[in-house]
From Swiss-Prot:
Xref: PROSITE patterns: MFS
Name of the protein in its database record: Glucose-6-phosphate exchanger SLC37A2
Cellular compartments annotated: Endoplasmic reticulum membrane
Organism (species): Xenopus laevis
Gene Ontology CC, one term: endoplasmic reticulum membrane
Primary gene name: slc37a2
TM annotation in the entry: 21-40, 86-106, 116-136, 143-163, 187-207, 208-228, 302-322, 334-354, 362-382, 391-411, 434-454, 458-478
């Protein structure tokens, strides 16, 4: 007597070939960009080891008792160590911001698989060279700044490439919700990077860079062998873009629900799939100026500049603010600061889901930004009154600050890169993503730098700066919000990408 078919096999049979490939692409790109963030994190962990409080340690026999810097790593042992360590952050962030504007242009013109895998391998090499400085006993500041600059440039290959790949495989149906979940790779990478770097920092801080460097390089090799750039390359059905969806609506006498899950593709017969696999014509790349002319690109780019300024100021300064203002020890402050990342994951999913349901990404971002300003004010004055208040406020601030940031850098970028004004004759995903994220990276470089200057006068000034940046981000979306409100009043479910 035969048993029934195994449950797992029945499940496998119920999943279409297209869905399997799409799920594989989601997991792959998630892991790839997790590696990018994983390899960025070590510098923030190692800083405490480069300059230490040597007075708390017993002096070796050959070290004078008056030498209070013997355990620090030159040239970071002097009183200006904060400026020197800050220069490492600035070197990375500025080179990343500049390189991002060119990364998209190269990404559109080079094979995506080669571009992403090569960038990951090169980034792994440059990250490892930071760690080699420990074993080679290098104490020259220029060495570390040089490889921070080179690594910043190499890291620009990641974001445009993974967003382009996601955009190639998935239509607009539930892109915001799926990408909101997918965008949690940032927090996952930060957490893993902290754990891996922290495991070696006290014994041999060089490994805090070398191990993450090996990991991202290894995944770069995996990317080279397994990444599929377009669904047509493996005979899968490509996602419908706006113009194609309109054509189908005109010719098929049945209702079409644009919010159907992105994993369900239009049925195609074997001959169509075979033909698509045999002969794939990919569209022509778009110019930098051409990408700027796409409606919404400039507004969302400038909005992200200020939104990312707020987000990265929290990223670099939140642990110190918690330690100073709430009198937590550094470890507890660091643990509490991760709640901001947890809120960011929730905010990204929430913003993406609302955007999918309403089709109004500009309004979604603006509402969250409007709520952010008073919440920052409240957190500054009342957020440290108790541990429960601190936890709640950190999660809420993470939701409101990182929600718009996540939505703009993922679903909005992908939507604009497949805008209907392109009429199918140009691809712009990588270039648009690079322009938007590059603009945001300018804010990411400015925010922590300004916070360092203003914090010496008091933390209130830092929060005033963050509130002002948040208001600017709101105002920059005013035109798109106005158009979306008009479309709502007209009874249309029309987003900025169709204006």
């Amino acid at each position: 007597m035969r048993s029934s078919l195994a449950p797992a096999i029945r499940l496998m049979q119920s999943v279409s070939r297209d869905s399997c490939y799409r799920g594989f692409i989601i997991v792959m790109t998630f892991l790839f960009y997790t590696c990018y963030h994983l390899s960025r994190k070590p510098i923030s962990i190692v800083k405490g080891q480069l300059h230490r409080n040597c007075s708390a340690l017993p002096n070796p026999p050959n070290i004078s008792e008056n030498d209070t810097t013997w355990c620090s790593w030159a040239p970071f042992e002097n009183t200006n160590y904060k400026e020197l360590l800050g220069s490492l952050d600035t070197a990375f962030l500025v080179s990343y911001a500049i390189g991002m504007f060119f990364s998209g242009i190269f990404g559109e013109r080079l094979p995506l698989r080669y571009y992403l895998s090569g960038g990951m391998i090169i980034s792994g090499i440059f990250t490892s060279f930071m760690g080699f400085g420990y074993y080679w006993n290098i104490h020259a500041l220029w060495y570390y700044i040089l490889f921070q600059i080179l690594n910043g440039l190499a890291q620009t290959t990641g974001w445009p490439a993974v967003v382009t790949c996601m955009g190639n495989w998935f239509g607009k149906g539930k892109r915001g919700f799926i990408m909101g979940i997918w965008n949690s790779h940032t927090a996952v990478g930060n957490i893993l990077g902290s754990l891996i770097a922290g495991a070696f920092v006290s014994t041999a801080w060089g490994l805090s860079f070398i191990v993450p460097g090996i990991i991202i390089a290894a995944f770069g090799i995996f990317c080279f062998f397994f990444l599929v750039e377009y669904p047509e390359d493996v005979g899968c059905t490509p996602p419908q873009q706006p113009e194609e969806a309109k054509h189908d609506l005109e010719n098929i006498p049945v209702s079409y629900n644009s919010t159907d899950t992105i994993f369900k593709s239009t049925e195609s017969n074997a001959d169509d799939s075979e033909n698509a696999h045999t002969e794939v014509e990919h569209p022509q790349a778009i110019s930098f100026i051409g990408a700027l002319r796409i409606p919404g690109v400039v507004e969302f780019s400038l909005c992200l500049l200020f939104a990312k300024l707020v987000s990265y100021t929290f990223l670099y300064w939140l642990p110190l603010y918690i330690a100073n203002d709430a009198q937590f020890d550094p470890k507890a402050a660091g643990d509490l600061s991760t709640l901001f990342d947890v809120g960011g994951i929730i905010g990204g999913i929430l913003a993406g889901g609302i955007s999918d349901y309403t089709g109004k990404s500009a309004i979604t971002c603006t509402i969250m930004l409007i709520l952010t300003a008073p919440m920052l004010f409240i957190y500054n004055y009342f957020g440290q009154t108790g541990i429960s208040t601190t936890i709640a406020m950190l999660i809420i601030c993470g939701i409101l600050v990182n929600g718009p940031y996540s939505l703009i850098t993922t679903a909005v970028s992908a939507d604009l890169g497949t805008h209907e004004s392109l009429q199918g004759n140009a691809k712009a995903l990588s270039t648009v993503t690079a322009i938007i994220d590059g603009s945001g990276s300018i804010g990411a470089a400015l925010g922590p730098s300004l916070a360092g200057v203003l914090s010496s006068r008091g933390w209130n000034y830092v929060f005033y700066m963050l509130i002002a940046a948040d208001i600017c981000a709101c105002l920059l979306l005013a035109r798109l919000v106005y158009k979306e409100i008009r479309s709502l009043c007209g009874g249309e479910r029309k987003s900025y990408t169709e204006m």
